[in-house]
Amino acid sequence: MSVEELSKEQVQMLRKAFDMFDRDKKGYIHTNMVSTILRTLGQTFEENDLQQLIIEIDADGSGELEFDEFLTLTARFLVEEDTEAMQEELREAFRMYDKEGNGYIPTSALREILRALDDKLTEDELDEMIAEIDTDGSGTVDFDEFMEMMTGD
């Protein structure tokens, strides 16, 4: 898929993911975060393919990608998937952690999900991501917050 083929919703989702990892709001992310972002978005890929593409797109070898470069790179890995099917998969994943069926999961469960998606995340990175998602500090994440985090919607 090319950047031109991305829907407005996909670009918004990727912007949200990019911003989540651009913690200092410098306008770029480090190339080592790309695989984490792709996994968070539920994309599968060969690590070697990703590294080769990063080398191509990060031509100056700075290890930093601006949003347009990130968009070019991630567009190649995005699989066109029915939005409803993706939402259903996420709903199912949420239900697995919402053991009591009360409509929310503790942030500790969210931490497990994020760690499962990328085992290279540090405790500080996990804390920052959870703080961004659990904006009211309740220690829980409801399905809407979970969906917003996972899809940018």
Curated annotation (Swiss-Prot):
Residues noted as binding Ca(2+) 1 in the record, renumbered to the chain: D58, D60, S62, E64, E69
Pfam families: EF-hand_7 (PF13499)
Entry annotated with the keyword Repeat: yes
SMART domains membership: EFh
Annotated residues for binding of Ca(2+) 2: D134, D136, S138, T140, E145
Listed CDD domains: EFh (cd00051)
Classification via Gene3D superfamilies: EF-hand
GO terms for MF: calcium ion binding
One GO term describing the cellular component: myosin II complex
Role this protein plays: Troponin is the central regulatory protein of striated muscle contraction. Tn consists of three components: Tn-I which is the inhibitor of actomyosin ATPase, Tn-T which contains the binding site for tropomyosin and Tn-C. The binding of calcium to Tn-C abolishes the inhibitory action of Tn on actin filaments.
Family: Belongs to the troponin C family.
PANTHER family, per database record: CALMODULIN LIKE 3, MYOSIN LIGHT CHAIN 1, 3
Protein name: Troponin C
Species, as recorded: Tyrophagus putrescentiae
